[in-house]
């Protein structure tokens, strides 16, 4: 019963967070300009964006670590390349109108370097959209008081330990830990707090940085919309929308 309760909380949280992020990305593409999908998987976001605002393949670019997923994307005719986002973005300055990373930042070893690269490749008045978990939650504090590790990460390089520490499995049953592989896709390395991520985005030149919180656990779903507005700082997931201003361009 309790596991189902938290699973419902999680599913609602992710649905709302992704919904806002996708609507924001889609809205930014109503004007001319290209979009960069970081952690593009097999290009699945292209279908969503194309359906929402009719973006064509020529405006969609993606970068993905997994070569098999890159192959799937290119077979669809999408411009998705293989690359390691810890090592910079292989694109020229001011190339994109919008750059987005959904559930990606926590998987990087060098997330601050990555965010600087996002700033570099964005056009003036370009938009960055980030969706990532928040380490500074009441639920995390509760786990630490119990002597356990934060469920949001960082995570150790042991699948057995991660499964042992997991109180409830709220994600899909098909999503299994892969931390012991040579190329872990699901492992969380660095997890920001709401205030730290907001302040860092501002420090590297972004302005109009707006953050949103989703999922203030353990409160029930019917209270979430109100609580998320009152206290976005301690929600389970956070979405940040940030503009590269002409006046702040470095």
What residue ranges belong to the model's regions?
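Conserved N-terminal segment of class I S-adenosyl-L-methionine
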Residues: 1-92, 98-102, 115, 190, ...
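Short, cationic motifs built from Arg/Lys/His that form the positively charged side of catalytic pockets
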Residues: 17, 120-123
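A generic structural signal for alpha->beta connector loops
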Residues: 57, 77, 125, 205-208
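Short, conserved acidic/polar surface loops in the N-terminal third of protein domains
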Residues: 73-75, 91-93, 140-143, 153
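A short His-aromatic
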Residues: 103-107
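S-adenosyl-L-methionine-dependent methyltransferase catalytic module, highlighting the catalytic core
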Residues: 109-117, 127-245
């Amino acid at each position: 019963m309790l596991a189902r309760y938290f699973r419902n909380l999680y599913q609602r949280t992710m649905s709302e967070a992704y919904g806002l992020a996708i609507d924001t990305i889609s809205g930014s593409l109503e004007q001319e300009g290209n979009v960069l999908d970081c952690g593009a998987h097999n290009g699945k976001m292209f279908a969503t964006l194309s359906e929402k605002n009719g973006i064509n393949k020529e405006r969609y670019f993606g970068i993905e670590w997994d070569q098999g997923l890159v192959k799937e994307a290119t077979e669809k005719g999408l411009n998705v390349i293989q690359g390691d986002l810890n090592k910079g973005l292989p694109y020229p300055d001011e190339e994109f109108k919008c750059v987005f990373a959904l559930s990606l930042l926590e998987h990087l070893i060098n997330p601050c370097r990555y965010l600087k690269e996002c700033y570099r490749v964005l056009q003036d008045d370009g938009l960055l959209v980030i969706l990532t978990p928040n380490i500074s939650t009441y639920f995390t504090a509760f786990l630490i008081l119990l002597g356990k590790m934060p469920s949001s990460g960082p995570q150790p390089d042991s699948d057995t330990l991660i499964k042992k520490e997991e109180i409830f499995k709220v994600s899909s049953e098909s999503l299994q830990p892969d931390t012991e592989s040579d190329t872990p896709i699901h492992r969380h390395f660095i997890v920001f707090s709401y205030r730290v991520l907001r302040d860092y985005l501002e420090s590297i030149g972004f302005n109009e940085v707006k953050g949103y919180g989703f999922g203030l656990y353990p409160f029930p779903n019917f209270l979430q919309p109100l609580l998320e507005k009152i206290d976005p700082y301690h929600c389970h997931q956070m979405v940040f929308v940030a503009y590269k201003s002409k006046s702040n361009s470095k």
